[in-house]
Each structure stands twice: as structure tokens, then as C-alpha cells.
Amino acid sequence: AFFANYPFVLAPGMGLNAYFAFTICAQKGYSWHVALAAVFVEGIIFIILSAVNVREAIFNAIPANMKKAVSVGIGMFIAFIGLQNAGVVINNPSTCVSLGDVKTVPVALALIGTIITLVLVIRKVKGALLVGILITWILGIICQLAGVYVVDVEAGVYSLIPTGLISAPPSIAPIAGKLSFSGISIFDFIVVIFAFLFVDLFDTLGTLIGVSTKAGFLDKEGKLPRIKGALFADALATTVGAVLGTSTVTTFVESASGVSDGGRSGLTALTAGVLFLVALLFSPILTTIPSFATTPALVVVGLMMVENVRDIDFSDYTEGFPAFMTILMMVVCYSISEGLVFGVISYVLLKLFGGKKNELNPVIVIIAILFFLKLILG
């Protein structure tokens, strides 16, 4: 809000949360104190990279066609997450995913809520996304009161009716300032830092590209004015967040919701931050809002992001295929950064062997090599 005056909201990255908890702590056996130390060092490195314009150079090196593809991919990704959260799409061991049971209340209300939200958007109702969430939630409460929606805590079906209004937020004392550099070798520590660094760097750049493209922030050369401030804020948040006890803080993809509803300045990010603080007090109410109630907003925002697909040049396969791979892999790999990996590598290879190597710039080639090494070395 203050460094760059953009509507980009910062929060702990969900994918990085999973990597932090399941890969670093559960699988590799390191303590969360060590993982926080790695996040802290990663943040320091990001501050340095932002100060010397390395992250900005990477952002500017991404081809214009791929920037549009990132926006589309994020839209598909957001919509898929929304459908998955509501159970519209479920895991299937045979086909990976399949359609959920549309006769269940969460799935039915998610689909009904999506139609309601779209009607509100079409009729240009201000705050249509928020209104759609509230209407879907209220419909869920009605279903619970009518006995159609049955609470079963053991099965993960929770009450939609708040049991209180305000509660004191929990203390951060047990986790704040608990960084530790002991219990891990220097080599392993560097590997952990690099893993956090890679995912955070390209998740952040992907989000900035996608949301900026949708908002129309990019100039004629595909560059984002004042990007240095946005990247510095992101890096500083990661560093401070680690000290306070949270995993990597990043520019999160749901920023697209604010942009889709008209947000164009830092006031949007500032308002979101203030509301996050207020939400700490009203957790008894907010925690009862079910995931199926937020599905309509995510699906509609996804639709708005996908609109950029019409601007992608698919006639030239050296441009069209990398854009296609960016979109596809972002969704099927459940990762913004992995979408960029396959998009950039295919872009460089097709330009190189397709007789258009003069269209490559050194930075994108270096990025492609690093991406390739990342795939090989894991």
C-alpha cells in the first residue's frame, strides 16, 4: 500500500505453508524453528535481490504473451481451488479428479451461489462478490435450520451458525522470535533456503504478472511501473513474518478478487490489512463461513482473469505453445511457479530451434537454464 500504491495483498502463501510443514518439517525431520530461520534468510536475500533490481529484471524478461497466459492460468487455478474447496471437484484414485455429489448441500449451494454471484456481477451490483458469499452462507444456515445440512464434526461438517461474536486473538508469544540455526548442516540449510527462494520468487512474480495484467497496470513494454516498491514490500514482509513466527509471506493470488471488484490502488491493500486485524476479533463469526460460500467468488474471479486469453497470440506456435503450457501446468501441477517453469523452458527451446533465437534475451535464457536444473535436481 505504501511502497508501491498497488492493490496487492500480502499473506502467508498456502503452497509454501504446505512445503514448510510437510516437506521441511514432517518429511525431512527439521524443526519448525529451523524452517523459520530459512524463511528469514530467504527474506534477507530477497531484499538484496530487490535492491539490485534482479527480481525486476526477471519480471521484465517474461515475454508479453506469457504474461497474459499467467493471468489466464491464475484464473483457472483460482476457479479450480474454489470448486475443490466446495467438493464440486473431488479426488479420484482412478482419474485424479472427478465430479463430486451434486446432491449434497455444500456442492449444490456452491453452484447456486455461483449463478447468484454472476447475476449480481452482470447487473453491476457493487460488492457483488461479497454479497454472493453472504447470500450463499445464509442459504447454508437456512439448510442447517431446516435439517437438510446436518452437522457432523468428526466428518468435517461444521455448524454454519456462529456461537459467539467476539473473542480475544491467541498470543503469538509461543512462536515469535523462535528462529534456530542449529540442528542442520550448512549444505542442507542452503538447500532449504533455495527451495523456499525458488517457489516464493516465481509464485510472487506470477501473481504480480497475472493480477497486473488483469488490472491493466502493465505499460506498452509489458513492464510494471513502481515494481521495485512492490517487490521490496514482499521481501520485507517475508523477513518480518519469519520473526513473528509465520511461514513465507507472499503476494497472494486472491488479490485478484479486489482488482476484479474495482481495486486499483494501495488503499485496497491497506483496507484488506485492516480488515485482517479486525477479523482476529470476530473469529467466532468468520470461522463459520464455509468454504462452499467462498467458491462462487473464486469461480467468478477466475472467469474475469481468463478473459485475457483472447489477447494471446496462438497463431505463432513459438508463442502459443509456451502460453498453453503455462496455463495447463499451472492448474494440473497446482502451482503458479511450475506453470512458469514449463512455459519458460518451452519458450526458449522453441525459439532456439524454431529459427527465432534472435527474439531471445539473455535473462530469459538464464531463467530457463535455472528452471531446467531445478527440474533435474528436484
Label the predicted regions.
Residues F2, G13-F22, A26-I74, V211-N308:
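Helix-loop-helix junctions within the multi-pass membrane cores of secondary transporters/permeases
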Residues I115-S171, L197-L201, M329-V341, L350-V363, ...:
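Flexible hinge motifs at transmembrane-helix junctions and intramembrane kinks/re-entrant loops
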Residues G15-G29, S257, L270-G378:
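Transmembrane alpha-helical segments and their short flanking loops
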Residues A1-V9, V119-K124, A195-D203, D234-L244, ...:
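Transmembrane alpha-helix interface/packing and boundary motifs in multi-pass membrane proteins
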Residues S98-L99, I133-K228, I369-L373:
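Helix-loop-helix hairpins and the membrane-proximal interhelical loops
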Residues A4-V9, W32, V54-N65, K124-A128, ...:
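Interfacial helix-loop-helix linkers and transmembrane-helix boundary segments
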Residues F40, I44, I48, L111-V119, ...:
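Generic alpha-helical transmembrane segments of integral inner-membrane proteins
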Residues F22-A35, A57-A69, M76-V119, L145-F181:
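Inter-helical loop and helix-membrane interface segments of multi-pass membrane transporters/permeases
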